[in-house]
Structure formats: structure tokens, C-alpha cells
UniProtKB/Swiss-Prot annotation:
The organism's taxonomic lineage, starting at the top: Bacteria, Pseudomonadati, Spirochaetota, Spirochaetia, Spirochaetales
Highest taxon of the lineage: Bacteria
Function: Responsible for synthesis of pseudouridine from uracil at positions 1911, 1915 and 1917 in 23S ribosomal RNA.
Keywords: Cytoplasm, Isomerase, rRNA processing
The protein's name: Ribosomal large subunit pseudouridine synthase D
Gene designation: rluD
GO biological process: enzyme-directed rRNA pseudouridine synthesis
E.C. designation(s): 5.4.99.23
Organism the protein comes from: Borreliella burgdorferi (strain ATCC 35210 / DSM 4680 / CIP 102532 / B31) (Borrelia burgdorferi)
Length: 326
């Protein structure tokens, strides 16, 4: 048994917090709330203060809950046939083209609509193969909710450990593409820094002189257009929000980044322009494979504001050829 903390924002008014929990999160039935010793805290003036579960909550309230979690919760997860394209699959691994807007694994406010739920639907033996896992069966590495693209998952624990060790040892080649605000003035380069939790907002990360963990990102300019740039990014380390933090630090925030970017009223419909384009990794027995996703549609739509159709098609064809061996 472990003690777990989760934060969420209330989406609608409710007469009681416990009723809101049981009505919105499948894992918190009325009996589960009592059995798991749920305690609740509400943010007030920047601090979380303890409240009773019988208290009413209102839309946009920020709530922190603490509860007991069993060592294995995989049986609580439900399979879900989420539309996710499969790039590659064999008996040990499955490589997905994760859509934007889908979490890699369940969290307090997303229990049935994540990559894990898709894996449980698609791989019937997943629960048996990961019976010692909690709520992340098959997840080797993670993409943020609004980051799309290549995501490799394991079908059994031995493969998960084999793949995860390659990420840990930096023996993979990961290439992302991003559209950033501003014309990039360096053709190629790198940024190395420490990344730590932000002092003022614990949900964010920031570059630090000497605190946190070392992070290294290599970048390559692909295209300057209008007031924007298209970049290829290679994270040589795997820190949370690394690419987004490094681009902000360079003063070229990723377009559509509501956390690290600038608010631009003219671009309200633009979502995060960050895409996991390519992954090279050994899938077993020295079988190194290169997995490439499609050039994302939202990138094409945005670029079409600056180029005619024939010209844009040629540009994308050339980019695809370049990125294949980058």
C-alpha cells in the first residue's frame, strides 16, 4: 500500500466533493473513497487547505486529494478502442502514432481514454503479462498529452525493461519537429542546462544554473517562414517538458504551448506544434529499427498559410527525405 497525491480542477459545481469524485472518476466509488482513506485539500490564496469530503465544490476549484493505492491497480483499468494508428507490431513491441490530446497513461481525471486503455483493448494478454504493474502496463516512455507522434510500447515486462534501458543509456535516436515563434538565427546547435521545477509554479519546469537534472537538446533549422521557424529537435536526455522548456529559454517558444508559450489572440485555435517524428531503437536481438510517423496534418494546415499547394508539397517531400537520415 502506498500513499498517492493527485491534483485536478473541478469542471462543474457539486453539492459534495465525495459525490463529485464518485461521479467523475470510476476508481472513486463511495465505498472506495472510504476504503482508500481519501483526504481532500482545496487551494486558497496559493495554499492547499484541508476540507471535508462533504463540503460543496465549485467549477474551477483546484483540489488536491491523497489516497491509499494498492500495489497493483491494473484490474481497475478498462479496455477502450481509441482510434490510434499502429506503425509497427510484433510479438514483443507495438509502435503507435499517438494522436494529440491523448494521455500516455491514466491519471486522476483520465481513466478510460489513454494509450494504456488502447493497449488493453488491442493486446488481450496485457493484464496477465503485467500483473505486477500498477497503471502503466506497456508504457516504456511518455509523450505529453498534446504531443503527438511515435510512441513505442512493450507487450511484456522483459521487453519493457529491455527498451527502457536503452532510453536510460541514451542508445536511442529521437527526432521531434516543432514550429516555434520567431525566425531562428542558428542553422544548428545545442543547448545544455539544468532543468528543475519552477520556483513559482510546481506544475512547470524551468532552466536552472545549478539545480535539478542535466538536460541536452540538439536542434536543426529546417525552415524559416513568416514570423515562425520549423525545427528538428533531438532530446539527448529525457527530462519532463525538456523541449518546451529549452525552446522557451532560447526565446523561441513552441507555437500553441499554453504553459510555456506566449498568449497570442490571433492564434487561439492553434494547438501544441510539437510532434515525435522518428524513433530509432533496438527491438530485440540487435534488430535496430527506424520508426517514422506521418508529417502531422496540423503542421501542413499551418504551413499552407504561407505557401501555395505545389510549393508546400515539394517542401514537405524534401523535409521527409532529410529527416529520414537525420
Amino acid at each position: 500500500m502506498i500513499r498517492v497525491k493527485r491534483e485536478f480542477t473541478v469542471k462543474e459545481n457539486a453539492l459534495r466533493l465525495d459525490l463529485y469524485l464518485s461521479g467523475n472518476f470510476e476508481v472513486f466509488t463511495r465505498s472506495q473513497i472510504k476504503r482508500r482513506n481519501v483526504e481532500a485539500f482545496k487551494k486558497s490564496n496559493g495554499k492547499f487547505l484541508k476540507i471535508k469530503l462533504s463540503k460543496p465544490v465549485f467549477k474551477d476549484d483546484e483540489i488536491l486529494i491523497e489516497f491509499d493505492e494498492e500495489s497493483s491497480q491494473i484490474d481497475c483499468l478498462r479496455p477502450s478502442n481509441i482510434p490510434i494508428a499502429i506503425i509497427y507490431e510484433d510479438s514483443n513491441v507495438i509502435v503507435l502514432n499517438k494522436p494529440q490530446g491523448i494521455l500516455s497513461h491514466p491519471g486522476i481525471s483520465h481513466w478510460d481514454d489513454t494509450v494504456v486503455n488502447f493497449l488493453l483493448y488491442h493486446i488481450k494478454s496485457l493484464k496477465i503479462n503485467f500483473n505486477e504493474e500498477k497503471i502503466r502496463p506497456g508504457i516504456v516512455h511518455r509523450l505529453d498529452k498534446d504531443t503527438s507522434g511515435v510512441l513505442i510500447c512493450a507487450k511484456n515486462i522483459s521487453t519493457l525493461r529491455f527498451l527502457a534501458q536503452q532510453f536510460k543509456d541514451k542508445r536511442t535516436n529521437k527526432v521531434y519537429i516543432a514550429i516555434v515563434k520567431g525566425n531562428f538565427n542558428s542553422f544548428f546547435g545545442s543547448i545544455e542546462s539544468f532543468i528543475d521545477r519552477d520556483k513559482h509554479n510546481r506544475k512547470k519546469f524551468s532552466v536552472s544554473k545549478d539545480r535539478g537534472k542535466k538536460a541536452l537538446t540538439e536542434y536543426r533549422l529546417l525552415l524559416n517562414f513568416g514570423e515562425y521557424s520549423l525545427l528538428a529537435l533531438k532530446p539527448k536526455t529525457g527530462r519532463t517538458h525538456q523541449l518546451r522548456v529549452h525552446m522557451k529559454y532560447l526565446n523561441f517558444p513552441i507555437l500553441g504551448d499554453e504553459v510555456y508559450g506566449r498568449v497570442d489572440g490571433s492564434l487561439k485555435k492553434i494547438t501544441l506544434m510539437l510532434h515525435s517524428y522518428k524513433l530509432e531503437i533496438d527491438v530485440g536481438k540487435n534488430s535496430f529499427k527506424k520508426f517514422i510517423s506521418e508529417f502531422p496534418k496540423r503542421f501542413v494546415i499551418f504551413l499552407s498559410n504561407f505557401y501555395k499547394s505545389d510549393e508546400l508539397n515539394l517542401i514537405i517531400d524534401n523535409l521527409v527525405l532529410f529527416l529520414r537520415d537525420f
